[in-house]
């Protein structure tokens, strides 16, 4: 499995339920890397997408504790282990914070876009790989 993320200089990834910013070159990179591959994400991350809809041309494996949550074009799982049991090796973990933390030890590659600035008030963070000896 692999992860893909955009972080600021403090490894922040979000603020107030949204991404820190939307950079067209990074969005294109994300699209190039993930198109044709399964993506694993949480329900709150899905809510940040245009229209709150699953990504096109990808198998969307979505974690949600809400049994009534059933977005068209997505497969919903209430337990991470159930989602991982169906996730092939080429799956991309795409957020959010909790899912990254729970799956990082299962990833063999992390694609990081590092923004050389900080976002005051950021409230969601990716594990700091600069301080992780294994990375």
Please identify what each model-predicted range represents.
Residues 1-135:
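Enzymes that bind and transform nitrogen-containing heteroaromatic metabolites
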């Amino acid at each position: 499995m692999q992860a893909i993320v955009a972080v600021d200089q403090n490894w922040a990834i979000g603020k107030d339920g949204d991404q820190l910013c939307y950079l067209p070159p990074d969005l294109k990179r994300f699209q190039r890397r993930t198109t044709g591959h399964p993506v694993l994400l949480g329900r709150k991350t899905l809510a940040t997408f245009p229209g709150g809809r699953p990504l096109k041309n990808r198998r969307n494996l979505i974690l949600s504790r809400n049994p009534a949550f059933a977005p068209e074009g997505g497969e919903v799982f209430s337990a991470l282990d159930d989602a991982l049991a169906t996730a092939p090796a080429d799956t991309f973990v795409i957020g959010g914070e909790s899912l990254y933390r729970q799956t990082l030890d299962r990833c063999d590659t992390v694609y990081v876009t590092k923004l050389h600035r900080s976002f005051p008030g950021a409230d969601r963070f990716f594990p700091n790989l600069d301080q992780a000896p294994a990375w």
